[in-house]
């Protein structure tokens, strides 16, 4: 794995996590 792959994976994980928090927040959980 190179640095670009690791960076891209980290960005996708962070984006998915933040998106999940927004969805859960709007759902009132």
Curated annotation (Swiss-Prot):
Keyword Flavoprotein (UniProt): no
Cysteines engaged in disulfide bonds, as pairs: none
Main location: plastid
Coiled-coil region list: none
GO terms under cellular component: chloroplast thylakoid membrane; cytochrome b6f complex
GO biological process, one term: cytochrome complex assembly
Subcellular location(s) per record: Plastid, Chloroplast thylakoid membrane
Source domain of life: Eukaryota
MF-aspect GO terms: electron transporter, transferring electrons within cytochrome b6/f complex of photosystem II activity
SUPFAM superfamilies per record: PetN subunit of the cytochrome b6f complex
Family indicated by similarity: Belongs to the PetN family.
UniProt-listed HAMAP family: Cytb6_f_PetN
Function: Component of the cytochrome b6-f complex, which mediates electron transfer between photosystem II (PSII) and photosystem I (PSI), cyclic electron flow around PSI, and state transitions.
Name of the featured protein: Cytochrome b6-f complex subunit 8
Organism: Chaetosphaeridium globosum
């Amino acid at each position: 794995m190179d640095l670009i792959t690791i960076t891209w994976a980290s960005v996708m994980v962070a984006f998915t996590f933040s998106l999940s928090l927004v969805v859960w927040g709007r759902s009132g959980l």
